[in-house]
Design a protein with these regions (language model features):
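Residue-level signature for tetratricopeptide repeat
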Residues: 117-120, 137, 154-156
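"A position-specific structural signal for the A-helix of alpha-solenoid helical repeats
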Residues: 113, 150-152
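Helix-turn-helix repeat elements of alpha-solenoid scaffolds
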Residues: 119-132, 159-169
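Short solvent-exposed coil/turn linkers within tandem alpha-helical repeat scaffolds
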Residues: 49, 96-100, 134-145, 160, ...
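N-terminal leader/targeting and pre-domain segments
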Residues: 1-22
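Non-catalytic, surface beta->alpha helical segment in thiol-disulfide oxidoreductase systems
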Residues: 44-47, 78-114, 118
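Loop/turn elements at helix/coil->beta-strand transitions in domains of secreted/extracellular proteins
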Residues: 22-26, 57-62, 81, 89-92
């Protein structure tokens, strides 16, 4: 049976220990009191059944307060809430998303965040699968060009650093999302 809430923990050190033991990336939700975006994220996005299942199955979820956990949060240079971060098992931040995210887009953010962590651990096939999930879920979605960009990079590294690999994948961005920042970032 799937829990009906995300199994948040509130201790950063515990999250890192569990991440190493369970070999899962850490999803960090940084919030503050009287933050309307934080409230919407908790009440709308993090109560969505599919988001709950994906977070509980794939991540160590930690919930940190912008000011009560100031020593931790300050090291990350955060200035806005809500901020959703993705860290590897050493605690190094690998991806961030700022402000409120609706549930359907959060699924894409989860995939891109996990992919970015996987890429840093040289798990390129896992990263590619996560990024393809974004493309399949929302072929013309707001996160799709970014997913294609990172997939090009993951395929480049998987294939031993062949520029033709990345260029082939990135050609998709030029064709489908020519006005995106992800098209402009290509060398």
């Amino acid at each position: 049976m799937t829990p009906d809430t995300i199994s948040w923990i509130a201790n950063w050190d515990e999250a890192k220990v569990r991440s190493r033991a369970e070999r899962k990336p850490i999803l960090i939700d940084v919030y503050q009191d009287n933050c309307s975006g934080c409230e919407r994220l908790m009440m709308e996005t993090f109560t969505d059944p599919q988001v709950i299942q994906e977070v509980n199955d794939r991540f160590i979820p930690v919930h940190l307060h912008m000011f009560n956990d100031r020593a931790i949060v300050r090291d990350w240079g955060l200035f806005w809430t809500p901020t959703v971060l993705f860290a590897d098992r050493t605690g190094k931040i690998r991806y961030e998303s700022i402000n409120y995210i609706p549930a359907d887009v959060m699924l894409d953010v989860l995939d891109i965040g996990e992919a970015r962590v996987a890429m840093r651990w040289k798990e390129m096939d896992n990263a590619i699968q996560r990024l393809l999930s974004v493309e399949h879920r929302h072929p013309d979605g707001s996160m799709t060009a970014e997913a294609i960009y990172w997939r090009g990079m993951a395929e480049y590294f998987r294939d031993g650093g062949k520029p033709a690999t990345a260029k082939r994948v990135w050609a998709e961005i030029n064709e489908r999302f020519p006005d995106s920042i992800w098209a402009a970032r290509q060398p």
